[in-house]
Amino acid sequence: LGQLGFYINQSLCTGCKACSVSCKDKNNLDVGINFRRVYTYENGSFMEQPGGGIVHNIKAFYYSISCNHCTNPKCLPSCPVGAIFKDKDNGVVTIDQEICQGTQLCVKACPYGAPQYNKKVFKSNKCNLCIDLQEKGEDPVCVATCPMRAIEFGPIDELRKKYGNVSQIKGMPSDTITNPNLVITPHKDARLSSS
């Protein structure tokens, strides 16, 4: 298969959070722990008209993000006990719950906020691209539940060939930090980052 990754069509995302809720449900995550998050981006301004009144050019759009299973994951070398692994076949980055000691250094190292710390079990965990579902021939739960079909997954080379190479938009960390395995079709009103 090669390196797996996500494709996000930001122009289709309505911010409904079905992806986030289904991920939370599948992984039985406590309040405050989200392996997939949906952010709202807003831009524009209000302008006063010379004769009175106000007009606006306010735009809002949404972005769904989880672990990007980066080529150069900052979480991996940050773990002092070696609990984080990048699969050599599919590139999926996972945290071994048997080894994790909850130092939270991975949480601090990831520019995307992917690892989430669970205070109840004193361990960090994150998206594993629903490897268990993939082994049964199913899509990751976030992909399967998106009513707008704004999320896809697959070999990143194929996704890039099909959708291009945009992996950073306004409000996101520089894609040069970790080389995320992510492709984005930006919303028409999104201002692309200058990377």
Model-inferred region functions:
Residues L1-S195:
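Non-ligating segments of multi-cofactor redox enzymes
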